[in-house]
Amino acid sequence: MNERDDILQAVYEVILDRKGALPESSYTASLFHKGIDKILKKVGEEATEVIIAGKGGKREEIVYETADLLFHTLVLLGHYDIAPADVYNELRRRFGTSGHAEKASRNE
């Protein structure tokens, strides 16, 4: 792992620690308590905010909103006990493969 992986893993571990906590103890615990529909709603909201920030073209806003999207995506992964390493491995599998070839392989 490198420094980028480490911060995502560190955040993920905190998220998992809060998974079984009382909802009033943290924002993350409250998301888990509200269930998958609330988590998915937040991921969708944050994705929309990234799109809006991207359209606006302001670097700071894009970075800020992308951080929110990554956080909420990690909560989604945590809900299903999917480690960030699983996503990294999928990206590594795709790396160096043409996007067209990768997409075609999914249709086989």
Swiss-Prot record:
UniProt-listed Enzyme Commission number(s): 3.6.1.31
One Gene Ontology MF term: ATP binding
Pathway membership: Amino-acid biosynthesis; L-histidine biosynthesis; L-histidine from 5-phospho-alpha-D-ribose 1-diphosphate: step 2/9
Protein origin, superkingdom: Bacteria
The entry's keywords: Amino-acid biosynthesis, ATP-binding, Cytoplasm, Histidine biosynthesis, Hydrolase, Nucleotide-binding
SUPFAM superfamilies the UniProt entry points to: all-alpha NTP pyrophosphatases (SSF101386)
Reaction catalysis annotation: 1-(5-phospho-beta-D-ribosyl)-ATP + H2O = 1-(5-phospho-beta-D-ribosyl)-5'-AMP + diphosphate + H(+)
Species of the source: Geobacter sulfurreducens (strain ATCC 51573 / DSM 12127 / PCA)
Encoding gene per record: hisE
Name of the protein in question: Phosphoribosyl-ATP pyrophosphatase
Family as reported in the entry's similarity comment: Belongs to the PRA-PH family.
